[in-house]
Regions:
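Short, flexible, solvent-exposed loop/turn segments with mixed acidic/basic and small polar residues
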Residues: 64-70, 163
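NAD(P)-dependent Rossmann-like dehydrogenase/reductase catalytic/cofactor-binding core
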Residues: 155-170
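Aromatic/hydrophobic pocket-lining residues that form the small-molecule binding cavity
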Residues: 8, 12
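Conserved small/polar residues in nucleotide/adenosyl-binding loops
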Residues: 1
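Internal alpha-helical scaffold of NAD(P)-dependent oxidoreductase catalytic cores
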Residues: 68-153
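Rossmann-like NAD(P)(H) cofactor-binding subdomain of soluble oxidoreductases
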Residues: 13-64
Length: 170
């Protein structure tokens, strides 16, 4: 499931009757603690959950910006919960390998959120702050690759990232 943190619970709840016993559900949301709890609270008996987070992405979303190589050589964090079965975790690991991820890590949802706060969330905040502090009188002629690289992720989906920041505010 790929959606915003606030939407995932509703998606699972609406579709829970479609999940067959033995199914494995995963998400690729950028925050794990609250999403994992939310998903597990509405999963039917006999359906397993294992969280996942591919460490790849773009500042532009949508089908037109899709790339078959997005996950190639990327990291992938698998975030099982206490009830996740070993074989389900292995299935998610195999899926991560299949899409091209090579650095696969297992972490608790809490550990994931703690580290991602620094390695991703803070970087998005810093990029946005840099863009907002850009003097209007400054001409783009004064910028080059380093400015572009530092500010690339500031072109984010504001609704999605507001939810991610709020969900990982601890």
């Amino acid at each position: 499931i790929r959606d915003s943190p606030d939407s995932i619970h509703k998606i699972i709840e609406i579709n829970a009757h479609r999940f067959k016993t033995g199914a494995v559900i995963s998400d690729v949301c950028g925050v794990k603690s609250s999403v994992s709890e939310s998903i597990c609270s509405v999963l039917p008996e006999g359906v397993d959950y294992v969280g996942g987070h591919p460490m790849a992405g773009k500042e532009m979303d949508g089908f037109v910006n899709a790339s078959s190589e997005l996950f190639w050589m990327s990291g992938y964090i698998i975030t099982p919960v206490k009830t996740s079965k070993k074989e389900s975790v292995e299935l998610i690991r195999e899926i991560a390998k299949y899409i091209g991820s090579t650095r696969i890590t297992i972490a608790s949802p809490e550990e994931h959120d703690s580290v991602i706060a620094y390695t991703s969330d803070l970087m998005h905040i810093a990029a946005s702050a840099l863009c907002l502090s850009y003097p209007e009188k400054m001409n783009r002629a004064y910028t080059a690759g380093s400015f572009r690289d530092c500010t690339r992720v500031a072109r984010i989906n504001p609704k999605l990232w507001s939810e991610l920041f709020l969900a990982n505010r601890k």
